[in-house]
Regions:
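Acidic/proline-rich low-complexity IDRs
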Residues: 1-2, 11
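N-terminal extracellular ligand-recognition/capping segment immediately after the signal peptide
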Residues: 7-17, 23-47, 52-58
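Right-handed parallel beta-helix/beta-spiral solenoid domain characteristic of secreted/periplasmic
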Residues: 5-9, 45-107
Length: 162
């Protein structure tokens, strides 16, 4: 397993983009601090972990109602602070936040968008003003251990039935 240490001020996306394209498990350990950037993880078997959700935060600020240079709205599915589009990935001991507010002006603002089988979210905090977590299609093996989903309750997820 490959272990990579990242500190505040370093670009997490640059580290992810430089990962080997093999199938070896990788853990990216984030030192305590704030990582202000939009992240896309498309490499399988990759874990992003912090020391605790209280001290390690990944944050960005895209809202669905934002007008892009082409004159169109951003839309919900392009607002995620962290996109995980790979299988067997994990997120541990991290806060992922979409800081776009207020809801009435920005619309939906995903913190975490997961499209991959076997995703594990452990001891994390997810924050946004609306639609904090989005999984699509519903993965058959979604794992949420001791994770906070958002400011309101939600219905249980049933793969292939929603």
């Amino acid at each position: 397993m490959l272990l990579i240490q990242v500190a505040p001020g370093q670009s997490l996306q640059t580290v992810i983009d430089a990962l080997p394209a093999d199938n070896q498990p990788v853990t990216i350990h984030l030192a305590p601090g704030v990582y202000e950037e939009k992240i896309a993880l498309r490499r399988p078997r990759t874990c992003i972990e912090g020391e605790s959700a209280e001290t390690t935060r990944v944050t960005w600020h895209d809202g669905a109602a934002e007008i892009l240079p082409d004159g169109k709205k951003r839309g919900t599915f392009r607002t995620a602070t962290l996109l995980v589009n790979a299988r067997d990935c994990a997120l541990r001991n991290v806060t992922v936040e979409n800081s776009a507010y207020p809801r009435e002006q920005v619309g939906q603002a995903l913190a975490l968008y997961v499209d991959g089988d076997g995703f594990c979210c452990e001891d994390c905090t997810l924050k946004s003003c609306q639609d904090t977590l989005f999984t699509a299609p519903l993965p058959p093996r979604e794992i949420q251990k001791d994770g906070f989903i958002g400011p309101t309750q939600f219905l249980p997820r049933i793969p292939q039935r929603q």
